[in-house]
Amino acid sequence: MPGSEMPAPCVFAPDMAEQVPLWHHYLLAIQSRESPRVQDYQRAENILLTVLERVHALDSRFIVDYSRDLEAFQFALRSSEDPLDVEVLLGVDSEALLIEESEATEPGDGPAICRLGVLKEASGLEPWMTADIFSVSSEDRDKCCGHLVPSKVLCVLKDLLVAAIVHCKHHRLIPPGSLNAANLKEGQMRLSLLVSSGWRKIRFNVVPVVRKKHRVPALEGAQLKLGFPEGILRRIASHGVDLVPANAQHWRISTGYLLSRLLDALGSLPGHRLDSLSILDRVNLESWQGGSQNHGLTFDHLKTVLLWASTLFPAPEDWADLQGSVYRQLVVLLCCLATRKLPHFLYPEHNLLQDGGLDLGAIYQRVEHFASQPEESLRIHVTHLGPSRPPRIDNGVKALLQLPASDPTYWATAYFDFLLDKFQVFNIQDKDRISAMQNIFQKTKTMGSENS
């Protein structure tokens, strides 16, 4: 391991204090685009809601959800153009449904897939037991008389969307050319619509949802309570879960709404949590994706990193300055890239980086370069040009970042404080945290001696 003695924690080097305006200039440039982005989103959403209202008029089993304002909030935060999910509620009495978890789910696959059975003793569910969305059970001993079939529900919803779009265009309820349904195809778990709003095009994925009371154990964990406003986890848990199509026969728990509520809760706390997320999302779009939005980190990846960073750094002073806030997310992100594992925030056994198409080695190099020398990515105007500063880290940092892969106990505040100090942004005066961080240094120093 690099280093032979623990230096005094670096509060702020003089040249870093000079950099602070650079971070704020970059943030202000992002924020200047927020209002137009929100207006574009609201226009696009209005077009989509007009279509969905017609869907409901054609088939009252499908309900327009007007209660969700979190997508607009997130759309304003980010610079990336990832598709947005829009949920269409199934107006079924969810208490009359039984979640039958599949035994075939592999460990680490995240939320279990399940079937949704209609209980035999349930009454008033005749609209949900028609052949277009329902499959009769062949087993007499089952508690259920049959199941809601995702592929059938999606097929009905797709046909309704097509009919609704035709109606809205014919009656001029939506602007000409504002909605493209070319990707609305059979067999998809999400129904994709491209909506034009001014010069911006926003892709929405329409998803049928069954909302049901169901425990999410992670929301009851003591660790999460440290980083969030008091009582918020209990209120979020009371919402229940959203079940969305996983495949033709099975549903799965969607955590999108729960995670968005957690992100929104962070925005109510003082500090730069959401500002730093906006900065990293912009840097990701401009510098880390290598010109492609299809095979890089997504806003959801970065959102998960912030949620973990908020539990690892729960103190208000961790988020008091903008640069330090960015680096609290960066050290978590770098660790996840180095170990090739980003745990799902509510289902930590599920690795969000295991999906195909991500060149984690290349992404790591870009993120590490930014963390070591962020200036070139932050300069947005010729007046921001200045002399290049030396790298903040040495070549041995990747070995340190991989420690949690072999010893999960490193996934703790003291370890990440140690990494912050390596990047010269540990600006905490708490004696207990300094002592714990120095203990981590001594531990890594001992490991380095044993391996040499």
From Swiss-Prot:
Source organism, top-level taxon: Eukaryota
One Pfam family hit: Mab-21_C
Gene3D superfamilies noted in UniProt: 1.10.1410.40
Protein name, UniProt field: Protein mab-21-like 4
Organism of provenance: Mus musculus
